[in-house]
Amino acid sequence: MEIFIHYTSLPENKTLADVVGELNEVLDDSGVVSGGEENRLDLDLEDENINPKYAQLAVKSYLQKVGFPKDTTLEIGGMEIGIYL
């Protein structure tokens, strides 16, 4: 399963490499940042048996903690969810 992070800007004092590395740590063995394009990061959940809600909550918490903008969204299965909702 894939999760897409749609963002308009990175938090202050964070590079894209910082965010990718930290997200890989957050996902641990359950997933990895697999790519992306302009203003989007693609996350691949490697274990189909893991409930995607847990990964969503972990990623959402990380994005809030490091200060992503309020218009940042997570897309799962075609549905976009704001990270501050």
Where are these regions (language model features)?
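Conserved short beta-strand edge segments in small beta-sheet-based binding/regulatory domains
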Residues: 60-84
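Short, intrinsically disordered low-complexity segments
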Residues: 30-61
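Short amphipathic alpha-helix segments
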Residues: 10-31
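Hydrophobic beta-strand residues in large extracellular and virion-surface proteins
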Residues: 2-5, 23, 43, 59, ...
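Structural alpha-beta junctions
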Residues: 25-34, 64-70
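Short glycine-/aliphatic-rich beta-strand segments at the starts of folded cytosolic domains
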Residues: 1-13
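Short, solvent-exposed polar/charged micro-motifs at secondary-structure junctions
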Residues: 42-45, 81-85
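A structural detector for beta-sheet-dominated domains
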Residues: 6-8, 46, 77
